[in-house]
């Protein structure tokens, strides 16, 4: 426990976010490639997407303030101290795309279950 506290104190927010996003991506890839259930694969894809979103947020993190121009702050100081807004816009776009993909994947999984009476991908692939 002492070692974990030491690492947390020595690590900054951006590095912790990169490590967490890497772990989420690894967990998501493991679920996509090695899990047999279709619903669990969908959950793994969502975890993978969350890891990518967290990595994008960590890339845009600047350690400064939120990207809102306050009165009395020069443009140079504002640009130097604010977070990078493009990565945040990409994450918002990615969340919308992931939500629509989730709806389609769940719809396809319902159709697969009605046709094959199972959600195990090995059984579904053998029957085709």
From Swiss-Prot:
Keywords tagged on the record: Cell membrane, Membrane, Transmembrane, Transmembrane helix
Single GO MF descriptor: sodium:proton antiporter activity
Transmembrane parts of this sequence: 13-35, 42-64, 90-112
Cell compartments where the protein resides: Cell membrane
InterPro entries: CPA3_antiporter_subunitC, NUOK/Mnh_C1-like
Main localisation: membrane
GO biological process per UniProt: sodium ion transmembrane transport
GO cellular component, one term: plasma membrane
Protein name: Uncharacterized protein MJ1310
């Amino acid at each position: 426990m002492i070692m974990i506290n030491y690492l947390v104190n020595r690590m900054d927010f951006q590095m912790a976010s990169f490590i967490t996003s890497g772990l989420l991506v690894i967990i998501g890839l493991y679920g996509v490639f090695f899990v047999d259930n279709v619903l669990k694969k969908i959950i793994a894809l969502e975890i993978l997407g969350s890891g990518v979103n967290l990595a994008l947020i960590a890339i845009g993190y600047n350690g400064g303030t939120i990207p809102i121009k306050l009165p009395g702050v020069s443009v140079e100081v504002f640009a130097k101290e604010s977070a990078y807004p493009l990565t945040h816009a990409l994450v918002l776009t990615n969340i919308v795309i992931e939500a629509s993909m989730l709806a389609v994947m769940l719809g396809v999984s319902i159709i697969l279950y009605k046709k094959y009476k199972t959600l195990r991908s090995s059984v579904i692939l053998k029957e085709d």
